[in-house]
Amino acid sequence: MKTPITEAIAAADTQGRFLSNTELQAVDGRFKRAVASMEAARALTNNAQSLIDGAAQAVYQKFPYTTTMQGSQYASTPEGKAKCARDIGYYLRMVTYCLVAGGTGPMDEYLIAGLSEINSTFDLSPSWYIEALKYIKANHGLTGQAAVEANAYIDYAINALS
């Protein structure tokens, strides 16, 4: 899995050199931000269920047809609602993985690579998940550097869906 740290090490190793001062400063900066990232990951994990439930409700309010139309991709049945919550949870989990890893590697490898194919195969609208992620971003309760770190990965997911 790629992270800024592993990429810097791989580049230096490929070139048979030590890390440059610039690369070392970047790694040092990452370690300083790691405390805030871990705080954010813990908070998102501890509040995951309420964030997921709230995000699902935000989707249903913005796109009310999702709760009335029939089909496995809609939330008109308890099973459909459970699938919606599961999918929102997957996006939130990816954000926490990125926070722990310190880069977008987990999202790039486990989510974005097949995102458009999954959405088209199952007739899922990216706008549903964008709305869910916007809700999570607006309601996660994080402040300071922890919010900055979490919001960066939430925005990354939103941009990937756009």
From Swiss-Prot:
Keyword hit for Ribonucleoprotein: no
GO BP annotation list: photosynthesis
Record's subcellular location: Cellular thylakoid membrane
Binding-site residues, (2R,3E)-phycocyanobilin: C84
InterPro entries: Globin-like_sf (IPR009050), Phycobilisome_asu/bsu (IPR012128), Phycobilisome_asu/bsu_sf (IPR038719), Phycocyanin_a (IPR006246)
Cellular component terms per the entry's GO annotation: phycobilisome; plasma membrane-derived thylakoid membrane
UniProt entry keywords in alphabetical sequence: Antenna complex, Bile pigment, Chromophore, Electron transport, Membrane, Photosynthesis, Phycobilisome, Thylakoid, Transport
Keyword Electron transport: yes
Top-rank taxon, per record: Bacteria
Membrane topology: Peripheral membrane protein
Post-translational modification: Contains one covalently linked phycocyanobilin chromophore.
Subunit-level organization: Heterodimer of an alpha and a beta subunit, which further assembles into trimers. The trimers assemble into hexamers.
Family affiliation: Belongs to the phycobiliprotein family.
Function: Light-harvesting photosynthetic bile pigment-protein from the phycobiliprotein complex (phycobilisome, PBS). Phycocyanin is the major phycobiliprotein in the PBS rod.
Stored NCBIfam families: phycocy_alpha
Protein name, as recorded: C-phycocyanin alpha subunit
